[in-house]
From Swiss-Prot:
Acts as a flagellar brake, regulating swimming and swarming in a bis-(3'-5') cyclic diguanylic acid (c-di-GMP)-dependent manner. Binds 1 c-di-GMP dimer per subunit. Increasing levels of c-di-GMP lead to decreased motility. GO terms for molecular function: cyclic-di-GMP binding. This is Flagellar brake protein YcgR. Belongs to the YcgR family. Monomer. Interacts with the flagellar basal bodies. It is found in: Bacterial flagellum basal body. Keywords: Bacterial flagellum, c-di-GMP, Nucleotide-binding. GO terms for biological process: bacterial-type flagellum-dependent cell motility; regulation of bacterial-type flagellum-dependent cell motility by regulation of motor speed.
Length: 265
Protein backbone atom coordinates (compact mmCIF):
# COMPACT_ATOMS: atom_id res chain seq x y z
CA UNK A 1 0.00 0.00 0.00
CA UNK A 2 1.29 3.47 -0.85
CA UNK A 3 0.69 6.56 1.24
CA UNK A 4 0.33 9.63 -1.00
CA UNK A 5 1.42 13.03 0.27
CA UNK A 6 -1.91 14.35 -0.93
CA UNK A 7 -4.38 13.83 1.91
CA UNK A 8 -7.53 12.21 0.58
CA UNK A 9 -7.38 8.45 0.04
CA UNK A 10 -9.82 6.55 2.28
CA UNK A 11 -8.49 3.00 2.07
CA UNK A 12 -7.95 1.19 5.39
CA UNK A 13 -4.50 0.63 6.80
CA UNK A 14 -4.00 -3.13 6.79
CA UNK A 15 -1.03 -3.36 9.14
CA UNK A 16 -0.74 -3.58 12.91
CA UNK A 17 0.42 -0.08 13.78
CA UNK A 18 1.99 -1.22 17.04
CA UNK A 19 4.09 -3.95 15.40
CA UNK A 20 7.77 -3.70 16.25
CA UNK A 21 10.56 -5.13 14.17
CA UNK A 22 12.16 -8.22 15.63
CA UNK A 23 14.37 -7.41 18.64
CA UNK A 24 13.00 -3.87 19.06
CA UNK A 25 10.88 -4.61 22.16
CA UNK A 26 13.80 -3.53 24.36
CA UNK A 27 13.26 0.03 23.12
CA UNK A 28 9.59 0.08 24.20
CA UNK A 29 9.04 2.36 27.21
CA UNK A 30 6.02 1.83 29.48
CA UNK A 31 6.96 4.05 32.40
CA UNK A 32 4.55 7.01 32.49
CA UNK A 33 7.16 9.39 33.85
CA UNK A 34 9.59 8.55 31.04
CA UNK A 35 6.85 8.86 28.41
CA UNK A 36 5.79 12.27 29.73
CA UNK A 37 9.43 13.36 29.82
CA UNK A 38 10.06 12.46 26.18
CA UNK A 39 6.83 14.12 25.03
CA UNK A 40 7.82 17.25 26.94
CA UNK A 41 11.20 17.20 25.16
CA UNK A 42 9.32 17.19 21.85
CA UNK A 43 7.65 20.41 23.01
CA UNK A 44 10.87 21.98 24.30
CA UNK A 45 12.75 21.25 21.08
CA UNK A 46 9.81 22.26 18.87
CA UNK A 47 10.13 18.91 17.12
CA UNK A 48 8.03 18.13 14.06
CA UNK A 49 5.80 15.10 14.58
CA UNK A 50 4.51 13.20 11.56
CA UNK A 51 1.06 11.81 12.27
CA UNK A 52 -0.29 8.86 10.27
CA UNK A 53 -4.08 8.66 10.43
CA UNK A 54 -5.73 5.26 10.79
CA UNK A 55 -8.38 4.68 8.16
CA UNK A 56 -6.83 7.21 5.78
CA UNK A 57 -3.63 6.90 3.82
CA UNK A 58 -2.25 10.27 4.82
CA UNK A 59 0.61 11.81 6.77
CA UNK A 60 0.00 15.10 8.59
CA UNK A 61 2.81 17.23 10.09
CA UNK A 62 2.00 18.35 13.62
CA UNK A 63 3.60 19.17 16.99
CA UNK A 64 3.02 18.30 20.64
CA UNK A 65 1.54 21.38 22.35
CA UNK A 66 0.93 20.21 25.91
CA UNK A 67 1.42 17.24 28.23
CA UNK A 68 -0.94 17.16 31.22
CA UNK A 69 0.62 15.33 34.18
CA UNK A 70 -2.51 15.30 36.35
CA UNK A 71 -5.00 13.80 33.90
CA UNK A 72 -2.43 12.00 31.72
CA UNK A 73 -3.34 13.40 28.33
CA UNK A 74 -1.42 14.98 25.47
CA UNK A 75 -2.50 17.74 23.08
CA UNK A 76 -1.28 17.91 19.47
CA UNK A 77 -1.63 20.73 16.97
CA UNK A 78 -4.27 20.35 14.27
CA UNK A 79 -3.93 20.88 10.54
CA UNK A 80 -4.69 23.97 8.47
CA UNK A 81 -6.62 21.61 6.19
CA UNK A 82 -10.24 21.03 7.28
CA UNK A 83 -10.43 17.65 5.55
CA UNK A 84 -7.34 16.49 7.45
CA UNK A 85 -8.84 17.63 10.76
CA UNK A 86 -12.05 15.74 10.05
CA UNK A 87 -10.07 12.60 9.25
CA UNK A 88 -8.06 12.94 12.48
CA UNK A 89 -11.24 13.46 14.51
CA UNK A 90 -12.80 10.31 13.06
CA UNK A 91 -9.69 8.15 13.40
CA UNK A 92 -9.59 5.18 15.76
CA UNK A 93 -5.95 5.93 16.44
CA UNK A 94 -3.00 8.06 15.31
CA UNK A 95 0.49 6.67 14.75
CA UNK A 96 3.07 9.40 15.43
CA UNK A 97 6.75 9.62 14.49
CA UNK A 98 9.39 12.13 15.59
CA UNK A 99 13.10 12.48 16.35
CA UNK A 100 14.94 13.74 19.41
CA UNK A 101 18.66 14.31 18.88
CA UNK A 102 18.64 11.88 15.94
CA UNK A 103 16.91 9.17 17.99
CA UNK A 104 13.64 7.85 16.55
CA UNK A 105 10.45 8.05 18.60
CA UNK A 106 7.13 6.40 17.79
CA UNK A 107 3.88 6.32 19.76
CA UNK A 108 0.21 5.58 19.22
CA UNK A 109 -2.68 7.77 20.36
CA UNK A 110 -6.19 6.36 20.72
CA UNK A 111 -9.47 8.12 19.80
CA UNK A 112 -8.31 11.74 19.46
CA UNK A 113 -10.76 14.41 20.64
CA UNK A 114 -11.03 17.67 18.71
CA UNK A 115 -10.49 20.93 20.60
CA UNK A 116 -10.89 24.57 19.58
CA UNK A 117 -7.99 26.61 21.02
CA UNK A 118 -8.60 30.27 20.22
CA UNK A 119 -8.84 30.16 16.41
CA UNK A 120 -6.75 27.01 16.08
CA UNK A 121 -7.77 23.36 15.99
CA UNK A 122 -5.99 20.92 18.30
CA UNK A 123 -6.50 17.31 19.37
CA UNK A 124 -6.40 15.74 22.81
CA UNK A 125 -5.74 12.07 23.48
CA UNK A 126 -4.91 9.92 26.47
CA UNK A 127 -1.20 9.61 27.20
CA UNK A 128 0.13 6.62 25.22
CA UNK A 129 0.51 3.37 27.17
CA UNK A 130 3.92 2.84 25.59
CA UNK A 131 6.46 4.74 23.52
CA UNK A 132 9.08 3.36 21.18
CA UNK A 133 12.46 5.07 21.73
CA UNK A 134 15.10 3.62 19.45
CA UNK A 135 18.42 4.29 21.18
CA UNK A 136 20.72 2.23 19.02
CA UNK A 137 23.84 4.11 20.03
CA UNK A 138 25.92 0.98 19.44
CA UNK A 139 25.25 1.24 15.71
CA UNK A 140 27.34 4.04 14.16
CA UNK A 141 25.34 5.93 11.55
CA UNK A 142 27.18 7.60 8.70
CA UNK A 143 25.83 10.66 6.91
CA UNK A 144 26.60 9.93 3.27
CA UNK A 145 28.40 12.40 0.97
CA UNK A 146 26.08 14.58 -1.09
CA UNK A 147 28.17 13.77 -4.15
CA UNK A 148 28.58 10.11 -5.06
CA UNK A 149 25.91 9.00 -2.58
CA UNK A 150 24.64 5.43 -2.32
CA UNK A 151 21.22 4.86 -3.88
CA UNK A 152 18.38 2.58 -2.92
CA UNK A 153 15.76 1.29 -5.35
CA UNK A 154 12.46 0.20 -3.82
CA UNK A 155 10.08 -1.83 -5.98
CA UNK A 156 6.66 -3.33 -5.43
CA UNK A 157 4.15 -4.84 -7.84
CA UNK A 158 0.40 -4.34 -7.84
CA UNK A 159 -0.24 -7.74 -6.25
CA UNK A 160 1.82 -6.73 -3.20
CA UNK A 161 -0.06 -3.50 -2.56
CA UNK A 162 0.54 -1.09 -5.44
CA UNK A 163 3.02 -0.46 -8.24
CA UNK A 164 6.17 1.19 -6.96
CA UNK A 165 9.60 1.81 -8.45
CA UNK A 166 11.56 4.50 -6.61
CA UNK A 167 15.27 5.22 -6.92
CA UNK A 168 16.23 7.28 -3.88
CA UNK A 169 19.35 8.85 -2.44
CA UNK A 170 20.58 7.22 0.78
CA UNK A 171 21.20 10.06 3.25
CA UNK A 172 22.62 7.96 6.08
CA UNK A 173 23.53 4.34 6.65
CA UNK A 174 24.61 2.01 9.47
CA UNK A 175 25.06 -1.72 9.93
CA UNK A 176 21.41 -1.93 10.97
CA UNK A 177 19.66 0.13 8.32
CA UNK A 178 19.53 3.25 6.19
CA UNK A 179 17.52 6.38 5.58
CA UNK A 180 16.32 7.78 2.27
CA UNK A 181 14.76 11.12 1.35
CA UNK A 182 11.46 11.52 -0.47
CA UNK A 183 10.84 14.74 -2.36
CA UNK A 184 7.45 16.43 -2.49
CA UNK A 185 5.14 14.58 -4.85
CA UNK A 186 6.66 11.15 -4.28
CA UNK A 187 4.47 8.50 -2.63
CA UNK A 188 5.13 7.89 1.04
CA UNK A 189 5.88 4.36 2.17
CA UNK A 190 3.66 2.24 4.39
CA UNK A 191 4.72 2.31 8.07
CA UNK A 192 6.08 -1.02 9.38
CA UNK A 193 5.77 -2.61 5.93
CA UNK A 194 8.61 -4.77 4.58
CA UNK A 195 9.44 -4.10 0.94
CA UNK A 196 10.93 -7.33 -0.37
CA UNK A 197 12.30 -6.16 -3.71
CA UNK A 198 14.94 -3.53 -2.91
CA UNK A 199 18.45 -2.88 -4.19
CA UNK A 200 21.19 -0.98 -2.36
CA UNK A 201 23.90 0.42 -4.63
CA UNK A 202 27.07 1.50 -2.83
CA UNK A 203 29.75 3.34 -4.83
CA UNK A 204 32.34 0.96 -6.31
CA UNK A 205 30.41 -2.12 -5.14
CA UNK A 206 28.09 -4.66 -6.70
CA UNK A 207 24.34 -4.06 -6.13
CA UNK A 208 22.93 -5.66 -2.96
CA UNK A 209 19.42 -7.15 -3.23
CA UNK A 210 17.66 -7.07 0.14
CA UNK A 211 14.32 -6.51 1.92
CA UNK A 212 13.81 -3.26 3.85
CA UNK A 213 11.32 -2.52 6.64
CA UNK A 214 9.97 1.02 7.16
CA UNK A 215 10.67 2.05 10.77
CA UNK A 216 10.13 5.82 10.75
CA UNK A 217 8.89 8.55 8.45
CA UNK A 218 8.83 12.25 9.19
CA UNK A 219 8.97 15.65 7.54
CA UNK A 220 12.33 17.32 6.92
CA UNK A 221 13.93 20.16 4.96
CA UNK A 222 16.01 18.82 2.08
CA UNK A 223 19.48 20.25 1.23
CA UNK A 224 17.97 22.30 -1.63
CA UNK A 225 15.59 24.01 0.82
CA UNK A 226 12.44 22.19 -0.26
CA UNK A 227 10.35 20.09 2.10
CA UNK A 228 10.23 16.32 1.92
CA UNK A 229 10.27 13.24 4.12
CA UNK A 230 13.06 11.24 5.72
CA UNK A 231 12.27 7.52 5.78
CA UNK A 232 14.24 5.28 8.13
CA UNK A 233 14.44 1.64 7.01
CA UNK A 234 15.78 -1.43 8.79
CA UNK A 235 17.76 -4.20 7.10
CA UNK A 236 15.42 -7.16 7.52
CA UNK A 237 17.57 -9.96 6.13
CA UNK A 238 20.97 -9.06 4.72
CA UNK A 239 22.44 -11.52 2.20
CA UNK A 240 25.76 -13.15 2.98
CA UNK A 241 28.68 -10.74 2.78
CA UNK A 242 26.48 -7.62 2.63
CA UNK A 243 27.19 -6.57 6.22
CA UNK A 244 30.95 -6.60 5.56
CA UNK A 245 30.47 -4.59 2.35
CA UNK A 246 28.42 -1.95 4.18
CA UNK A 247 30.91 -1.75 7.05
CA UNK A 248 33.80 -1.33 4.59
CA UNK A 249 31.96 1.52 2.86
CA UNK A 250 31.26 3.26 6.20
CA UNK A 251 34.88 2.84 7.29
CA UNK A 252 36.25 4.12 3.97
CA UNK A 253 34.10 7.28 3.88
CA UNK A 254 34.76 8.00 7.55
CA UNK A 255 38.51 7.56 7.07
CA UNK A 256 38.50 9.90 4.05
CA UNK A 257 36.63 12.57 6.02
CA UNK A 258 39.04 12.34 8.93
CA UNK A 259 41.97 12.57 6.51
CA UNK A 260 40.54 15.74 4.95
CA UNK A 261 40.04 17.31 8.39
CA UNK A 262 43.64 16.59 9.33
CA UNK A 263 44.93 17.89 5.98
CA UNK A 264 46.31 14.53 4.89
CA UNK A 265 44.14 14.52 1.73
Amino acid sequence: MLVPMSEGDTSELDHDADHLAEGDERYLLRNKRQIRGLLQQLIDQRAVVTMHVAGRDMAVPTAVLEVDEDDDYVILDGSHNDASNRAIEQAKYLLCYAQLERVNIRFRLETPERLERDIHVAFRATLPDSLYHLQRRESYRLETPITDSPTCTIRQDAASGGNLNLQLRVIDISSGGLAVSLATGMPLLEPQHTYRDCTLQLPDSAPIALPLTVCSQYKMTLPNGSEGFRVGMQFSDLPRGADETIQRYIFRVDRQRNARKSGVF
